[in-house]
Amino acid sequence: MTDLSQHTPMMQQYWKLKNQHLDQLMFYRMGDFYEIFYEDAKKAAKLLDITLTARGQSAGQSIPMCGIPYHAAEGYLAKLVKLGESVVICEQIGDPATSKGPVDRQVVRIITPGTISDEALLDERRDNLIAAVLGDERLFGLAVLDITSGNFSVLEIKGWENLLAELERINPVELLIPDDWPQGLPAEKRRGARRRAPWDFERDSAHKSLCQQFSTQDLKGFGCETLTLAIGAAGCLLGYAKETQRTALPHLRSLRHERLDDTVILDAASRRNLELDTNLSGGRDNTLQSVMDRCQTAMGTRLLTRWLNRPLRDLSILQARQTSITCFLERYRFENLQPQLKEIGDIERILARIGLRNARPRDLARLRDALSALPELQQAMTDLDAPHLQQLAQTASTYPELADLLQRAINDNPPAVIRDGGVLKTGYDAELDELQSLSENAGQFLIDLEAREKARTGLSHLKVGYNRVHGYFIELPSKQAEQAPADYIRRQTLKGAERFITPELKEFEDKALSAKSRALAREKMLYETLLEDLIGHLAPLQDTAAALAELDVLSNLAERALNLDLNCPRFVAEPCMRIEQGRHPVVEQVLSTPFVANDLALDDSTRMLIITGPNMGGKSTYMRQTALIVLLAHIGSFVPAASCELSLVDRIFTRIGSSDDLAGGRSTFMVEMSETANILHNATDKSLVLMDEVGRGTSTFDGLSLAWAAAECLAQLRAYTLFATHYFELTVLPESEPLVNNVHLNATEHNERIVFLHRVLPGPASQSYGLAVAQLAGVPGKVITRAKEHLQRLETTSLPHEQPRAKPGKPAIPQQSDMFASLPHPVLDELSKIKVDDMTPRQALDLLYTLQTRL
């Protein structure tokens, strides 16, 4: 809207505010409702399933409108945020009684998916992250902020592959990118991607705003002074947070410099296939998180999720965690701590809301209870002798003065919001007590005053009353009015009665008529002062929250180690991966029968296992359990194995399962090849690689050739590789690649039924049992019978159309099959002409070497 003069004063005010937020929905406060107008109304009515109506006219046109009660706004906001919408909250700041024209309004807050802090709008078990990225194809700066905890980090990343892998790990709900980036870049395809003006990322202004935020002269103390791109991204994030919150952000106290070299990198496909915290259906059941999480606090659960999604390569941190878990297991110490931790609650997010000055009364009540529980928690930690646990216990100190302040201030069961009062205890503030007493006890005061005045004057028909026009009064019948004391001031004459006021009643009137509103204003002021007092202690309180969250995770991992029979892995300098009696931590929990544990041995003499065996035999489970054991070891956890000895890995890759990307125009085979290409380009001799059925999405010869070449490449890279395949031809790889060995998952048939034994044994499988699996799956018997006929033919001839179709029940004429019969090779011709008996051993050896170079 450009010409506002045609609009009513109310709509002029609306458009002046709306024009600053054209791409966001605006909730416009009018009395007890948030009204939504024009295109916003049409969109909101559809998204929220509420009635779209119209409100009068402005500029000659009716105004589309819908509305929601302001006291019920949270539920509607939650729905809009889940749908990825941003909402501008515009409140009345003027007094309708004194305003000339429209009541003054202003934007007090902008709610976006990445900057929400209200408890009702958040998933308590997951971080709510917003990220900003700046750079080009070679180098990117990434900044990540969790406004609900104050965690703020930066890192610089080389190349798109690493950036996309990191974005997959942090999974931000909003991603800010520069507006001058070309359209259609991979990062923009993520949900919540928003373009921001290029100057929002400008390095010098970003550096200045960050130094102001942290009250420092430079960023050297955070180790990121030279990270030009990351600083630009962090400055954009900080500006966006301030723009949406419309307040200072005292809970953002530092900037953490993260490095990819410190972590085990997992790409998007690997995270999806390993089902760390989300299963393949998008739910949370039967994930690694669901099995490993028995944390007592929501902040502990979120920290565990961060650990699972960011395994570390820092041996000192991993060993400190292992030692801590061992300490908790001694004399079952975790059992003493966990009940105490349960009393703490989610103070991490409560403190963030205090910093944002939007903490609710019940937040302060929960903080009060948490601070009151800290002394007993400290007592439970006195015998923890692991150095890391002692450090955490020291950080999680007690706050007796704050606990006492909140104990004196906040009612035991305060209301949800400060709006209607009733939050602060009687006795906390004398003036508030008096105002509340006046407001609540006015009736009793009038009864007492009437009794006292009757006794003082001797006028038995005296009455004390109130009306809205004249206020409080003392009423006497006309006959007794002449006997009124001298301090009675005439206020109103009625037929048959006179009304008076006294100095005492006038004083009470002045207090009582404004007592309620003054009490509410006083209580709100005291509440805000209380928040400011707490903000002054935010830094140590946030450190305490972080320490308690880590104590929660470590005690949880100790409990899991005991109840899931997990053992401590041992990190060694020698390159190896040796697992005895390893188990899949998730599958083991859902099976009704005992899980079959298996061994794994990879080292400098064996870097790859070619895994064969029947479908449903357990190949994928064996591979996934290896990856999960390695991942758990790299978060410092104990692992589901009798013993585990390994060296640090740098990446975990998985090429497992089949899926397409229809939206991206990629077939199942294209997705498979893209994942394979990523592995072959980025795997090193410190990487763990899981490859399952590579090449099955194309023709037999193409697929086999690709699988063979990929396996050879990985063997030469010396990556720790588990390569599952149904191409039996690959089992000859150990003959040419000395670092490759064969293993298989065994099965047996009994009464024409397959029995899976799930045991990993040396050597290749003898058969695949494909028809037996099909029969087990319920494929009709006649189809199985016909398949057996085709199988007999295919086992004795290269292609089915090369032989006439046999009559039912009669197999085709047996012939020796050769998978490569249709691919003649000149070396084969030359071999067929060699007269072996006429050659010396030396000549034969030389010829073999020559022929080998031609293969």
From Swiss-Prot:
Gene Ontology biological process terms, A to Z: mismatch repair
SUPFAM superfamilies linked: DNA repair protein MutS, domain I, DNA repair protein MutS, domain II, DNA repair protein MutS, domain III, P-loop containing nucleoside triphosphate hydrolases
Gene Ontology terms: cellular component: cytosol
Transcription regulation is among the record's keywords: no
Positions bound to ATP: G613, P614, N615, M616, G617, G618, K619, S620
Acyltransferase found in the keyword field: no
Coiled-coil intervals: none
Record keywords: ATP-binding, DNA damage, DNA repair, DNA-binding, Nucleotide-binding
PANTHER family according to UniProt: DNA MISMATCH REPAIR PROTEIN MSH1, MITOCHONDRIAL (PTHR11361:SF34), DNA MISMATCH REPAIR PROTEIN MUTS FAMILY MEMBER (PTHR11361)
Family stated for the protein in its record: Belongs to the DNA mismatch repair MutS family.
Name of the protein described by the UniProt record: DNA mismatch repair protein MutS
